[in-house]
A protein has these predicted regions:
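Buried hydrophobic positions in well-ordered alpha/beta secondary-structure cores of metabolic enzymes
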Residues: 4, 20, 62-65, 78, ...
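Gly/Ser/Thr-enriched, mixed-charge loops and adjacent short helices
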Residues: 1-70
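Proline/glycine-rich low-complexity loops and linkers
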Residues: 1-2, 6, 93-165, 170-172
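Short acidic, glycine/serine/threonine-rich loops at helix termini
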Residues: 28-32, 55-57, 87-92, 131-137, ...
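Short, glycine/acidic-enriched loop or turn micro-motifs at the edges of active sites
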Residues: 23, 82-86, 94, 169
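Short, high-confidence coil segments that cap the C-terminus of an alpha-helix
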Residues: 72-74, 160-161
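Active-site microenvironments of hydrolase-like enzyme catalytic domains
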Residues: 80-91, 162-164
Length: 175
């Protein structure tokens, strides 16, 4: 987590961020992380009781975050799944920003910082053609795996890549 925070230091200064923690793992840390990045955080579904994980909350019920962001006039929102290995974002209008767009944003950012190892992002065969076109325009290479974060991770380890993920919101970073 510390590594990710160094990549995004001060990048959320004064940004109004909604967080849907799905009453799961993110409940313990998400607010602290975004606060440390300078965000003004607004949190929902962060009271796990052992039974309510993912219950009408988080990335599998994105409409909850969409409404929360719009009703509170927030700048952006992030919804995690119960074990916090998946993240879906919404913009200020509640429009979904899926894993492909998140990969694009981080891939571009890492390339601009000279930190995109092997100039490559790992995706799955389910990624959108628009993502590949955008990577081509930026001169970023990509490798496609079978669907499943397991396969993305295996490719990253085998080939030494820094970032990979799925359209579903599983995003994986390595040092």
């Amino acid at each position: 987590m510390g590594y990710l925070m160094t990549l995004a230091k001060n990048s959320f200064r004064n940004v109004r961020v909604g967080l849907d923690c799905s009453n799961g793992s993110a409940s313990a840390i998400a607010k602290s992380v975004f606060d440390a990045l300078g965000a003004k955080t607004y949190v929902i579904n962060a009271e796990p009781d052992g039974l309510n994980i993912n219950m009408n909350a988080g990335s599998t019920h994105i409409e909850v975050l969409q409404n929360f962001v719009k009703e509170n006039q927030l700048d952006v929102g992030f919804a995690f799944d119960g074990d916090a290995d998946r993240c879906i974002a919404v913009d200020e209008n509640g429009n979904v920003v899926d894993g492909d767009l998140i990969l694009y944003v981080y891939g571009r950012y890492l390339k601009e910082k000279g930190a995109l190892r092997n100039n490559t992002v790992v995706t799955t065969i389910m990624s959108n053609f628009g993502l590949y076109k955008a990577f081509d325009e930026l001169g970023i290479d990509y490798e496609k795996t079978q669907v499943g974060d397991k396969y993305v991770y295996e490719n990253m380890v085998k080939n030494g890549h820094r970032i990979g993920g799925e359209q579903s919101g599983h995003i994986i970073f390595s040092k």
